[in-house]
């Protein structure tokens, strides 16, 4: 293994899944949301722009289209136009129903926007972080 080329130089590992990897390239520049699995969670989306509509997509967690309607459609993406805002009450809290831990990506679903940096992570922990930043 010592003479094995680095992971990013292998032909089979040159796709988007590696180019977005915090393990290989460090965390993305935008702020990373952090929570513990099961924490109650709300995300406030505010589009302060004046030109383009975006499609906010959160992988894994879901919320109700109409917050106060228990019969409302459950979704994981929403279009947001200039000067709009939404509060997403995440069902079952951080980690969602299945208790997902680790990094959950959220991004604009319009690929040029995603590719140009309109994405970040929601990091969900399963154990207490002491703030030192050390990896196990």
Task: Briefly describe each language-model feature range.
Residues 1-136:
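Copper-binding active sites and cupredoxin-like electron-transfer domains
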